[in-house]
Amino acid sequence: MQIAGRPLRISLFSGNYNGVRDGANRALNRLVDYLLARGAQVRIYSPTTPKTSFPCVGDVVPVPSVAIPGRGEYRLALGLPRAIRRDLAAFAPDIVHLSAPDWLGRSAQRHARRSGIPVVASLHTRFETYLSYYGLAMLRGPMERYLDRFYDDCDHILAPTPPIAEEFAGRYGGDRISIWSRGVDRAAFHPDLRDESFRRSLGYMPQEVVPLFFGRLVLEKGLDIFMDAILRARAAGHPVRPLIVGEGPARDWLAQRLPNAYFLGHLEGRRLGRAVASADVLINPSITEAFGNVNLEAMASGLAIISADVPSASSLIDTGRTGLLVPPLSGEAYAAALLDLIADPARRRALGRAASLAANACRWEETLAQVVRGYDKCLQRDKTGTGRE
């Protein structure tokens, strides 16, 4: 990857590059690895924590930050101080890539504007949907107006799904929007990793249908809807015992409400793939993701999926064929879908098989190349003077 006979230089700004092992951070680290392998130079600017969740890829410049109260794993960057601006000027990036619309991202965006550097943003989270989970729904309007200003000030936006790309095209202009989807590691997530002896070791009988929650245990993942669906299924006479894979500050909250759930905590690698493939149905009530990584990984593992009918899921799941989409925020709808799949094992298995086949099309090599094409479009517009003013 070259420009004017030298390596392309990219400055990536992240609110949390490796403090938490979530889908956004894993995607960004994969992207940096991909870019470096192709000869680009990448410099990452991000808050850092004393304890990281995984070894990060690339050179990280620590940005001054403070811990978010009650969520110490996340940090809030304190803007773009002079030392960081000097480092950025010395690196002289050809592109500034913003992965979050936070204070750091907005400060970097303004600096890039003043310096004449093209700005690319990638969408990873629907932050406006978080507010209702923390009693701040009244702030959604101001938040959406801020996000509109942020994305409208970008030269190019990488949307994770076609529905979101269409939404953003209507807001910010279709010529500035392209898709950066996500891939799945088929060696890590595959139906062949299902392990009946592992299920027995957790106390599950062969005939039991095991519903799975897979992801960070935080309220904004829809834990209240998951709990409601399980309790409704039990009230209907099915003593389902969910399997919970993941860790987070809401673990105790969920454990108190679902005392017979089996909590495996945080897993990685083959242990994670085995746990996912050994369940039967993924229930994903989250409406906050921009891309449903857990949906894709569970699909690759051969599970039937019950997911909220939101843009992050509807682009992956062909409802009735590779999974089931249900009205968001309706525990009753999730419970009804779960009960249908418990009653019809042939349909449940057919959904899982079709989902696993569909996941074959989601390859990291191809999705990461989408980012490079987005960079190229942005640079071409900058060269012809058709970028943002």
Task: Describe each model-derived feature in a short phrase.
Residues 319-320, 324-331, 340-346:
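Conserved acidic donor-binding segment of nucleotide-sugar-dependent glycosyltransferases
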Residues 251-271:
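Nucleotide-activated donor-binding/catalytic signature segment of Leloir-type glycosyltransferases, i.e.
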Residues 48, 163, 183:
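Carbohydrate-associated surface elements
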Residues 204-221, 227-231:
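Conserved donor-binding/catalytic core segment of Leloir-type glycosyltransferases
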Residues 287:
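Aromatic "clamp/platform" in nucleotide-sugar-dependent glycosyltransferases that forms part
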Residues 1-64:
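N-terminal subdomain of nucleotide-sugar transferases
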